[in-house]
């Protein structure tokens, strides 16, 4: 996770991790071979939580969840089936705890971006209509989304202080982005400094990277990004990455 926080709000972090760990649980589950129609056998698995976890996940009402999805050509096949399973689970959970649902955004096929989804059927229909193709412009898309969020944050603060909804961006990808690591680092640090300057609450924004598959060099890329973010930046909030 890229954590924009100082003290760490357990409720916020647990709610954030609850959604993100749906991805991890899907990837770790057994018997998840895709069927002949391209669906995933685990897509309809029931997700349950303890009473304590239920209370923590109620914190989802405090923020918007955005899945930024790598739809490059390398995501075709089994990886895309896993994306379907992850998002079906996530939609079910989000709808249970937050009437706003989730947003799904794509690196390449922006015509299929959807907002406030509470129906897993709509998620499946959207993903079924996409053929993964193209490169991995993660840096450019992350920059675009962070810039749009900061504009929204400023507008809300002018209307009423502390009224901007918190946001959690979960990136589903299988590889190293097209852009240099330094560009992604600058994008993240710039957003963190903007939040510092505007006295945003500690847990205003989070970014998590969920890596699907074991492509060479990917783990090293995000580990190095994490190390770079922890060093040499004069920030009032902690900034680090977490690779699921």
Locations of regions flagged by a protein language model:
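Acidic, low-complexity intrinsically disordered regions
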Residues: 1-244
């Amino acid at each position: 996770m890229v954590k924009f926080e100082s003290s760490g709000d357990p409720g916020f972090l647990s709610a954030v991790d609850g959604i993100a760990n749906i991805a991890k649980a899907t990837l770790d589950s057994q018997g998840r071979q895709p069927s002949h129609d391209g669906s995933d056998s685990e897509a309809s698995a029931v997700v349950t939580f303890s009473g304590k976890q239920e209370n923590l996940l109620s914190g989802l009402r405090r923020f918007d969840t955005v899945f930024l999805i790598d739809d490059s050509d390398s995501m075709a096949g089994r990886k895309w089936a896993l994306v379907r399973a992850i998002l079906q689970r996530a939609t079910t959970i989000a709808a249970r705890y937050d009437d706003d649902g989730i947003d799904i955004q794509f690196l390449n096929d922006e015509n299929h971006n959807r907002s406030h989804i509470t129906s897993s059927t709509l998620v499946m229909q959207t993903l079924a209509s996409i053929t993964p193709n193209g490169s991995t412009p993660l840096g450019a898309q992350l920059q675009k989304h962070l810039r749009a969020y900061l504009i929204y944050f400023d507008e809300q603060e002018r209307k009423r202080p502390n009224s901007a909804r918190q946001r959690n961006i979960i990136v589903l990808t299988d590889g190293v982005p097209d852009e240099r690591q330094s560009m992604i680092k600058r994008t993240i640090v710039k957003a963190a400094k903007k939040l510092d300057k505007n006295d945003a609450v500690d847990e205003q924004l989070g970014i998590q990277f969920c890596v699907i598959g074991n492509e060479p060099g990917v783990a090293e890329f995000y580990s190095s990004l994490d190390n770079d973010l922890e060093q040499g930046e004069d920030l009032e909030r902690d900034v680090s990455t977490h690779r699921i």
